[in-house]
Amino acid sequence: MTTVPRTTDLAAIRIWLTVVAGLIALMVLVGGATRLTESGLSIVEWKPVTGTLPPLSERAWTDAFEAYKTIPQYRQMNAGMTLHEFKTIFWWEWGHRLLGRVIGMVYLLPFLWFLWRGAVSGPLGRRLWLIFGLGALQGAVGWWMVASGLTERTEVAPVRLATHLSLALLIFAAIVWTLRRLAPRAEAEVPARLRLTAWGLVGVTFVQLYLGALVAGLRAGLVYNTWPDIDGGLIPKAANLWIQSPWWINLFENDLTVQFMHRMTAYTLFLLGAWHAFDVMRAGAGRTVVRGAHRLLAAILVQAGLGIATLLMVVPISLALLHQGTAIIVLTFAVLQAERLSPRRVAAVVVPQAAVAAGQAG
């Protein structure tokens, strides 16, 4: 017998997961602002419990500032910074970490409550445990990222930044998927190719998000600020794309190569989204599916326009954050469309309590 949440528990679970998803989206934006303001290395220690409180005295502020002075970023970029200026960057990083702790508590405490009530079990329970594990891993990945900028570099390693952001968005996507699975819907009778394309859109979106994080980590948006050409042409010279050795390093550390891949993946995402929007109409997939495809394509177009504007204007903070926020919307629409087209197993279907009672009586 499949165990399903009671009607009252189901409503509470959906509200809870919606709040967590919203907080994660906010966390991603605060993290983006922390990066854009060069604030991410202002706290040089990882104290998951005792680090909850900020400095509460002038002596504590001085100690925190002196600790910051020991890392390369201060010596090479911010030498001469005042304590007042340090406080500005400190608050961004502290707020980012505090929000992470808040998300952990907002997820964990209701989760334990639902477990105690027996409201989550089976596939739903396993999925929620997996999300919890990914959240715990994210905290460690965050410090792994910060640690990369404390010894030799003046910024965090771009690959670690991209890993940190990608994991946050993977958790967000898992919650969005779970929320959609908790909502009743009719099965979509569609050709298998539509499901394949929808999942392809999710995959390409994640690749694009990872590349966007690499662009941000490398500050690659501050160079090659022309469009549609890049480095003097629509396609850069191969010698410039593969200038570093070994060749694969260019995929992660060459400004030109990473920005070019980000552009090409954006074009791929648009073409795939446009094809999907056309194909669902041609297949007569139903109004809900067609609307989902059109919303996704519209979000991709808006995101592309914001990306081009951000590049041409040399990455103003407000526009860069808007670009990052719209990326979350694209991911949300892509995940929702993939779920909309995916068949549901019996264990994943939410059954009204009356139906459960009737089934047990029979």
From Swiss-Prot:
Membrane spanning stretches: 10-30, 102-122, 128-148, 159-179, 198-218, 266-286, 297-317, 318-338
Predominant location: membrane
GO biological process, one term: heme A biosynthetic process
CC terms in the record's Gene Ontology section: plasma membrane
Associated pathway: Porphyrin-containing compound metabolism; heme A biosynthesis; heme A from heme O: step 1/1
Signal peptide: none
Enzyme Commission number(s): 1.17.99.9
Cofactors (names): heme b
Subcellular location: Cell membrane
Keyword vocabulary terms for this entry: Cell membrane, Heme biosynthesis, Iron, Membrane, Metal-binding, Oxidoreductase, Transmembrane, Transmembrane helix
Membrane topology according to the record: Multi-pass membrane protein
Molecular function per GO: metal ion binding; oxidoreductase activity, acting on NAD(P)H, heme protein as acceptor
Positions that bind heme: 262, 323
Keyword Cell division: no
Family: Belongs to the COX15/CtaA family. Type 2 subfamily.
Known partners and oligomeric status: Interacts with CtaB.
Protein name in the entry: Heme A synthase
Organism listed in the record: Bradyrhizobium sp. (strain BTAi1 / ATCC BAA-1182)
Source lineage: Bacteria, Pseudomonadati, Pseudomonadota, Alphaproteobacteria, Hyphomicrobiales
Gene (name only): ctaA
